[in-house]
Amino acid sequence: MSKAFKLTSKFKPSGDQPQAIEKLVAGLEDGLAYQTLLGVTGSGKTFTIANAIEKVQRPTLILEPNKTLAAQFYAEMREFFPENAVEYFVSYYDYYQPEAYVPSSDTYIEKDASINDHIEQMRLSATKAITERHDTIIIATVSAIYGLGDPDSYLKMLLHLTRGDQIDQRKILQRLAELQYTRNDLELRRATYRVNGDIIDIYPADSEREAVRVELFDDEVENLSYFDPLTGEMLRRVPRITVYPKTHYVTPREKLLSTLDQIKIELKERLSQLEKANKLVERQRLEQRTKFDMEMILELGYCSGIENYSRYLSGRNEGEPPPTLIDYLPKDALLIIDESHVTIPQLGGMYRGDRARKETLVEYGFRLPSALDNRPLRFDEFEKLAPQTIFISATPGPYEEKQSDQVVELLVRPTGLIDPEIEVRPVATQVDDLLSEIKKRAAQNERVLVTTLTKRMAEDLTEYFTEHNVRVRYLHSDIDTVERVEIIRDLRLGVFDVLVGINLLREGLDIPEVSLVAILDADKEGFLRSERSLIQTMGRAARNVHGKAILYADRITDSMKRAMEEAERRRIAQSAYNEKHHITPKSIQKAVTEIIEGARTYTERGRFVNQAQLIAEEEAKYIAMTPKQLAKELRKLEEQMYHHARNLEFEEAAAVRDKIQHIRKGLLEVKE
């Protein structure tokens, strides 16, 4: 039931966007393996990519460096492609403590995790969409390179039912048990089913709001329909349905049995090695733990930590890459790596940390050596598996520069804004000079960002400015994501005029009201004063028509020189375009509510409505909770919802459901 990708937007490509779209599409059609979209802040990189996807009509995986940016990109893509499958694939752990052993203190730390039920459903929905539909866009984090169930085993386990099928009810229930669904005749929850005479109701694990009703008559499927699991309202009849497993780690019975045989062989070899090395405690520990896991797999089809046996479950040889989300992609898929200067190093760094932890577990008899193959992809493996790729960055890293067959520039903004003017001023008078600049900007109702090199200096500067009647706040690393969003909102609203921080490169700081960025000690070479960091930081003033960047330095370093030359090159290109097309630059107008616009619920009519007013008083309470407290609170609300449903109080149940949806969606955009 795939449709064509159809972009919905009131805007048309403008500025550099039309030529960038054309070049990217031509590059993809010519078979270029790697391209880079070098786009300045505010140039419409997301819109450009959305247009390219529509033109090439290919399923797309978009990798983001963190959950916050993934949620922002997901929200934008859903608005651009309302008729297509836009999915979200990030880590489903609210809290995660990996299994580990500390030999120095003989401390074993058991794996402990709190799984976010809603994100688990979204992950299952993503793999279902990419399996069934060509018109799919998945927005993911680095979670995409971690081991997932083998796609072949996963797809073999699907339960297909068609109207008119001859099938025994017991056979359907047996298949549901194999998919790890549990029977619950009292209340229907995700990944459960209930039986009432010849009617089987199934709540699919990948579904957010729809359950399936299978009506049998004398071992024949008489009717198939979708219904609302809360109200019982019948939504539509269908000729066929497919039920997907509860988890990506389901495996056909015959493969489970062969897996157990292989585990037995490896266990025997490893026990012999440990005995020869006189590691008797480790030998006993490994034998006990592995035999318990084998018993669980034999009886239930899974065990806690079954992913540690993924080498056998997926039928791979020692050292071969594990199956990941990338294995689920079709052959003609497209890969887009956003903020590639951050995401690429992240992808390269995941393997080593995971390996070191697991080697200790293997050495001390907590796991079999095959557990080492339950791991994220190495970067060289990722490169081999990756389809045609587009990197997106305002400051591409050395890897992108080396790999790219084509660099497509997006320098001109649709608003006509040019990159901020840059000035270098001496360090000796930096504080007093900055104070006078701040007062000028505050008088014009504009905002200032100040970046320092140390926490101490940021604190002293904030104190000094406060003494001089400047309304200032300090953004430090101890501030959580939610408070950070509130600080940014207050800055935009004019509650204060100056924001001081150390690392202002993180997301969410593209604020149109900021007309001055001050970089103190700009001549101290290092991570936060590198060419890329300087370009990114100066770009924070690029959304205001009076944008300016002041670098306080006693000498011009190589990084400063390169950053200033690049900024000047961009300014010249932008000014020339404006002159040619008679464009007068305008500051970006952006409603303040947008920055925290996560309080939205997707209604049955398929459109977003803002629900912030409904539970505004309670939102702060939920946001302030720890992941464990939040999971407990959501479970309590779900119990309340099912209680109403059992008592046939459907309106109350639907209200609680909407409240749960609101909390989840609201937190999705502010979580990291």
Curated annotation (Swiss-Prot):
Keywords: ATP-binding, Cytoplasm, DNA damage, DNA excision, DNA repair, Excision nuclease, Helicase, Hydrolase, Nucleotide-binding, SOS response. This is UvrABC system protein B. The beta-hairpin motif is involved in DNA binding. Its main location: cytoplasm. GO terms for molecular function: ATP binding; ATP hydrolysis activity; DNA binding; excinuclease ABC activity; helicase activity. Forms a heterotetramer with UvrA during the search for lesions. Interacts with UvrC in an incision complex. Belongs to the UvrB family. It is found in: Cytoplasm. Residues 26-181 form the Helicase ATP-binding domain. The UvrABC repair system catalyzes the recognition and processing of DNA lesions. A damage recognition complex composed of 2 UvrA and 2 UvrB subunits scans DNA for abnormalities. Upon binding of the UvrA(2)B(2) complex to a putative damaged site, the DNA wraps around one UvrB monomer. DNA wrap is dependent on ATP binding by UvrB and probably causes local melting of the DNA helix, facilitating insertion of UvrB beta-hairpin between the DNA strands. Then UvrB probes one DNA strand for the presence of a lesion. One of its GO terms (biological process) is SOS response. Residues 631-666 form the UVR domain. ATP binds at residues 39-46. It comes from Coxiella burnetii (strain RSA 331 / Henzerling II). Residues 430-592 form the Helicase C-terminal domain. InterPro entries: Helicase/UvrB_N (IPR006935), Helicase_ATP-bd (IPR014001), Helicase_C-like (IPR001650), P-loop_NTPase (IPR027417), UVR_dom (IPR001943), UVR_dom_sf (IPR036876), UvrB (IPR004807), UvrB_inter (IPR041471). It comes from the Bacteria. GO terms for cellular component: cytoplasm; excinuclease repair complex. A motif (Beta-hairpin) lies at residues 92-115.
